[in-house]
Design a protein with these regions (language model features):
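Acidic/polar loop patches that form or flank catalytic/metal-binding clefts of enzymes
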Residues: 61, 87-88, 223
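Residue-level marker of positions within ordered structural domains that often coincide
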Residues: 26, 51, 143, 193, ...
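Short, solvent-exposed polar/charged micro-motifs at secondary-structure junctions
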Residues: 74, 97-98, 208-210
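Alpha-helix capping/termination and helix-coil
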Residues: 54-57, 72, 83, 142, ...
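An anionic, glycine-rich sequence signature occurring as long contiguous blocks
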Residues: 81-199
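Basic, amphipathic alpha-helical segments enriched in Lys/Arg and hydrophobic/aromatic residues
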Residues: 169-236
């Protein structure tokens, strides 16, 4: 909800508002919503959304999934304090290559083959990596210089290490669920008039935004209950 205008041909400014949503990827319900000026960075709105979920909703959430625009250390720390795991795309930010590790921060062997993510120990918050499959026929395998298992505590660097580990198939599968947020955004804009806010004052625009999110959740709840009843009738 923003608009750009030219000022003296060279300068531009933004006015308007922005809605920030925390969406359940499985249910597609809006769990938490925040209304702000159009200039607020999405990353700065994330921690209030996370705290709102923790304080008001008692849900057995395991992961917080976000794109690279939310790759900030404070967000990882907040998710960790909530007892959950961050599945956030990594924004490299001109960082140099780390010797001894691949692009997903998994350790590599002498021949630069990546160790494979094996498991996560929640008690010690430790990721376990095992030997690469290439070690089976490597001449260095029996020389005693290659480590069979690597263990890394996720708290050593919350940005780089999470459970499941970056680059693993499990991590990729969880990250794909983030598309649910885009679907909800599309629903709100196309069917609930969120893309057609005509108010210039923040108070009225916020009421419009709150009503849209409330009506969406109510409609979703009604549709889900009807589906449950229909399924029960079919079984009976």
């Amino acid at each position: 909800m923003g608009r750009e205008k030219e000022l003296r041909r060279t300068k531009c400014f933004w006015f308007g508002y922005k809605g920030h949503l925390a969406v359940g990827t499985s249910s597609q319900y809006i769990l938490q919503a925040l209304f702000s000026s159009g200039s607020l960075n999405d990353g700065k709105a994330t921690i209030p959304l996370l705290k709102g979920i923790q304080e008001r909703l008692h849900l057995p959430l395991r992961y917080q999934t976000m794109d690279a625009g939310y790759d900030y250390e404070p967000i990882y720390e907040q998710v960790h304090r909530m007892g959950q795991q961050s599945v956030i795309a990594y924004n490299k930010r001109n960082e140099g290559e780390i010797i001894g590790y691949d692009k997903h921060f998994a350790p590599t062997c002498f021949r630069e083959h990546s160790y494979r993510y094996d498991s996560f120990d929640p008690k010690y918050e430790t990721l376990k990596y095992t030997r690469p499959k290439e070690c089976s026929d490597c001449p260095l395998a029996n020389e005693g210089i290659c480590q069979k298992v690597y263990k890394v505590k996720i708290t050593s660097d919350l940005r780089r290490y999470t459970a499941p580990a970056r680059g693993s198939q499990a991590w990729k599968n969880i990250f794909k669920r983030r598309t649910a947020v885009e679907r909800v955004n599309a629903y709100l804009k196309e069917f609930f008039q969120l893309n057609n806010v005509r108010y210039r004052t923040g108070k009225r625009a916020k009421i419009h935004f709150d009503m849209v999110t409330l009506i969406y959740n109510a409609s979703k709840l009604a549709a889900d209950r009807i589906n449950v009843q229909l399924n029960q009738q079919q079984v009976a």
